[in-house]
Structures are given as structure tokens and as C-alpha cells.
């Protein structure tokens, strides 16, 4: 799983940072998901390692323009770039469906693929054989949701040599053991497939906070995550601005990461006021503020990526 940042700024784009958009790639599945779609997201995709034709799902955290205004253009471009009409699912807060219908009534776009809009509420909003997506209400000026993407535990590898040494013949019995079933050999021995499977591999967990003040709900959602992507619009000396606008400081995001017990924290959604390297407070200072509380912190950059690898049961990367 690879997280790629398409926009890491807040409010409006700058020469260095576009507004919010984050891609999550599933390499083996050949698909990817998008979290928020600020204006200019499809332009960023032209320089990113994702194809719009392989976009499978979009998750909108809330209906502020810097997280939403690129959506209609991207949906239209997906029609032009898709040779096959693969379906697309769009998840988001109440009002997203009305927003979409209003745009379509004023400026109709004929989509060449099925689009399903799903209005979310707290809890599990998507599940398949490998992935569960859940959300919690964050703390912002408008309804805003944080999303958690969790892989299910992966069955351990089948121990082929051990099965052969136990005298299991190739064929149906071998296959039954691989499925974890019990089998009876010709000599009467009963073998349990569970004894021939290695330790299960824990699934990965990635959490996207969206826009939020420090939130107990987001903290609970993030518990044990491999990666927490949390907004840090302001430095802590601008705490009053953060509170007034419904945002977090870098220090507050780091405290959330620490209390949630996450492995890594990546900060995003930065105010442009810290971009001036000659100013009183720089992005490096913002990072240092967070690292004082949670050392495993990094800053997101446009078109930068973070690879989240699956850990083995012994805690090591495979």
C-alpha cells in the first residue's frame, strides 16, 4: 500500500502546494483510491504514478471547497480516459449527493460509467474480502469524517515441506490441508491443516484525519495504525487561529499520534504562512514542534509517497 500526496496545502493552492488530495494505491490489485479532491487534483495526477482509469473509489471528508472543487472535472476526465466503463464509488458526508446533482443540472456531464454516491455515517462503510473501511465524525466547522483503511489479517504461508515430511500425498488431501481443514491419511492419522500454516500476517492500517480540531473520535479511530495522516494547519503559537477555524496544530497532531500508539505520523494541510524560509517560523520548525512529542513524524510534500509495508507476526517487514 502506497500513500501519494496530490495536495498538501490548506485553503488555496500555492506555487509549492496544491490543495487537498491523497491517493492510496493497492499495487497487487492494480487500483487506487482517492481521499479528497481539491481543485487541480487531476492536474497533479498527470505527474503522479496513478492512472485516472484505475481509480476505483473516492472518499470525501467534508464539503469545503479545498477538498471538493476538483471532483466534477476529475469525474468528467475519467469518462474520457476510460476505454472500459468501470464503475466508480463516491463516499462522503450528507450533502455530497445534492452538490453533485446541482452541478449536473447547471452544467451536465455525461459520465460513461456507473457512479454510485454513498452518504456515510459513523461505522463500517465498505468491506470486501481483504479491506474494511470505517469512519468517525471529526471536529470541524462542518460535518467532517476521518477514514480508516484496514487490511484483514492474512493467513500464514502453507508449509509445504512439513506436509510432505508428514507423508501427505499431493492431490486433494494436500489441497484440504492448505485450506486449513482436517484430513485423514491412509494409515489412520488425522492431521489438522492449522498445524501446517505459518503465523498469520497482521493487516495494515492507514488513517486519514481530514480537517479537524483535536478529536477523541479520531484518536480512537487511529489506535494502532501503521500510518496516521493528520492535518497540521498551524503551529502551536497560532493555536487561537486553529481553534477559531476548526483545525489542529502540529503539536496537537503529534499528541494524537502518541496517545493512539501509531507507528508513523505524516502531517499535511499546511497554512502557507510557514512557507517563507526567511520568516520567523518555517516548515522545519513545524516539524520540530511535532517531533518533540512524536519523533516518528514527517511532513507531506506534493507528489511525495509513503510505502506502508505489511509486517510479519514477529514484527519485521517481509
UniProtKB/Swiss-Prot annotation:
Function text: Zinc phosphodiesterase, which displays some tRNA 3'-processing endonuclease activity. Probably involved in tRNA maturation, by removing a 3'-trailer from precursor tRNA.
S-S bonds: none
Catalytic activity: Endonucleolytic cleavage of RNA, removing extra 3' nucleotides from tRNA precursor, generating 3' termini of tRNAs. A 3'-hydroxy group is left at the tRNA terminus and a 5'-phosphoryl group is left at the trailer molecule
Cofactor: Zn(2+)
Family: Belongs to the RNase Z family.
Database matches in InterPro entries: Metallo-B-lactamas, RibonucZ/Hydroxyglut_hydro, RNase_Z/BN
Subunit structure: Homodimer.
GO MF term list: 3'-tRNA processing endoribonuclease activity; zinc ion binding
Catalytic-site annotation from UniProt: 66 (proton acceptor)
Binding site for Zn(2+) 1: 62, 64, 140, 211
Binding site for Zn(2+) 2: 66-67, 211, 269
Cofactor info, note text: Binds 2 Zn(2+) ions.
Gene source species: Brevibacillus brevis (strain 47 / JCM 6285 / NBRC 100599)
NCBIfam families: PRK00055.1-3 (NF000801), RNase_Z (TIGR02651)
Protein name: Ribonuclease Z
Database matches in Gene3D superfamilies: Ribonuclease Z/Hydroxyacylglutathione hydrolase-like
Keyword terms of this UniProt record: Endonuclease, Hydrolase, Metal-binding, Nuclease, tRNA processing, Zinc
Keyword Zinc: yes
Enzyme class, first EC level, given as a word: hydrolase
Tagged with keyword Zinc: yes
Domain of life the protein comes from: Bacteria
EC number: 3.1.26.11
Amino acid at each position: 500500500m502506497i500513500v501519494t500526496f496530490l495536495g498538501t496545502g490548506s485553503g488555496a493552492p500555492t506555487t509549492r502546494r496544491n490543495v487537498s488530495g491523497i491517493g492510496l494505491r493497492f499495487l497487487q490489485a492494480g487500483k487506487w483510491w482517492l481521499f479528497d479532491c481539491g481543485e487541480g487534483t487531476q492536474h497533479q495526477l498527470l505527474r503522479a504514478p496513478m492512472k485516472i482509469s484505475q481509480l476505483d473509489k473516492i472518499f470525501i471528508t467534508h464539503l469545503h471547497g479545498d477538498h471538493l472543487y476538483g471532483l466534477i472535472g476529475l469525474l468528467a476526465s475519467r469518462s474520457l480516459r476510460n476505454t472500459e466503463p468501470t464503475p466508480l464509488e463516491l463516499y462522503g458526508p450528507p450533502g455530497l449527493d445534492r452538490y453533485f446533482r446541482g452541478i449536473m443540472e447547471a452544467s451536465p456531464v455525461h459520465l460513461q460509467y456507473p457512479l454510485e454516491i454513498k452518504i456515510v455515517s459513523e461505522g463500517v462503510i465498505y468491506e470486501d474480502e481483504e479491506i474494511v473501511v470505517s469512519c468517525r465524525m471529526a471536529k470541524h466547522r462542518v460535518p467532517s469524517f476521518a477514514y480508516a483503511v484496514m487490511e484483514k489479517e492474512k493467513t500464514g504461508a502453507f508449509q509445504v515441506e512439513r506436509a510432505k515430511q508428514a507423508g501427505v500425498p499431493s492431490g486433494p488431501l494436500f489441497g484440504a490441508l492448505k485450506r486449513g481443514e482436517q484430513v485423514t491419511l491412509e494409515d489412520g492419522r488425522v492431521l489438522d491443516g492449522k498445524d501446517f500454516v505459518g503465523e498469520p500476517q497482521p493487516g495494515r492500517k492507514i488513517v486519514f484525519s481530514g480537517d479537524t480540531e483535536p478529536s477523541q473520535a479520531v484518536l480512537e479511530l487511529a489506535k494502532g495504525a501503521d500510518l496516521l495522516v493528520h492535518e497540521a494547519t498551524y503551529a502551536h503559537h497560532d493555536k487561537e487561529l486553529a481553534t477559531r477555524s476548526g483545525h489542529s496544530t502540529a503539536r496537537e497532531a503529534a499528541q494524537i499520534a502518541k496517545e493512539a500508539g501509531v507507528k508513523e505520523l505524516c502531517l499535511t494541510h499546511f497554512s502557507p504562512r510557514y512557507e517563507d524560509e526567511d520568516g520567523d517560523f518555517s516548515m522545519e520548525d513545524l516539524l520540530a514542534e511535532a517531533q518533540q512529542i512524536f519523533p516518528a513524524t514527517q511532513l507531506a510534500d506534493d507528489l511525495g509517497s509513503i510505502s506502508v509495508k505489511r509486517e510479519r507476526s514477529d514484527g519485521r517487514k517481509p
